[in-house]
Amino acid sequence: MSEENPCPRNIFLLCREYGLELEDLRILCVYCKRPLSDADVLAFAVKELFVVWRKGFPYGACEKCLIAAAKLRQYRHWHYSCYGDTVETETGIPIPQLFMRCYICHKPLCWEEKEALLVGNKRFHKISGQWTGHCMNCAPRCMENAPALRTSH
């Protein structure tokens, strides 16, 4: 490792530091200690999550553990929920300029996802002191809570 950056903070820097291709990286989950699958490594990288260092070894997080950790974080550290105008008033920063993650999968929200939350009059959630929302992938589906259709023949 280089002296100026002894512990790479993300998957891409870790690969560069050790001369590895992303698909060749083998890393364990910080929670369950199992090896991350190729899909888990890619998802961890795309979500721009930080590598955790323990006793000189890097760890990531598998998808299953990330979802469980997110749910636990919601239960333990949820402060309150409010609409976008309240978030902007509280922070003094327009929603599109705020860094936010999905409170379900941890993916950084893009401006289209933030805009969809604003236009849809959906709430943002303050969890562990950070403003969060849900990404398009984790958004409730429009028919998810609809009553089942009965068909007659």
UniProtKB/Swiss-Prot annotation:
This is Protein E6. One of its GO terms (cellular component) is host cell cytoplasm. Forms homodimers. Interacts with ubiquitin-protein ligase UBE3A/E6-AP; this interaction stimulates UBE3A ubiquitin activity. Interacts with host TP53 and EP300; this interaction inhibits TP53 activity. The gene is E6. The keyword Nucleotide-binding does not apply. Keywords: Activator, DNA-binding, Early protein, Host cytoplasm, Host nucleus, Host-virus interaction, Inhibition of host innate immune response by virus, Metal-binding, Modulation of host cell apoptosis by virus, Transcription, Transcription regulation, Viral immunoevasion, Zinc, Zinc-finger. Belongs to the papillomaviridae E6 protein family. HAMAP family: HPV_E6. A zinc finger (unnamed) spans 29-65, 102-138. Belongs to the low risk human alphapapillomavirus family. The cancer-causing human papillomavirus E6 protein has a unique carboxy terminal PDZ domain containing substrate but low risk E6s do not possess this domain. Plays a major role in the induction and maintenance of cellular transformation. E6 associates with host UBE3A/E6-AP ubiquitin-protein ligase and modulates its activity. Sequesters tumor suppressor TP53 in the host cytoplasm and modulates its activity by interacting with host EP300 that results in the reduction of TP53 acetylation and activation. In turn, apoptosis induced by DNA damage is inhibited. E6 also protects host keratinocytes from apoptosis by mediating the degradation of host BAK1. May also inhibit host immune response. GO terms for molecular function: DNA binding; zinc ion binding. Pfam families: E6. One of its GO terms (biological process) is symbiont-mediated suppression of host innate immune response. It is found in: Host cytoplasm; Host nucleus.
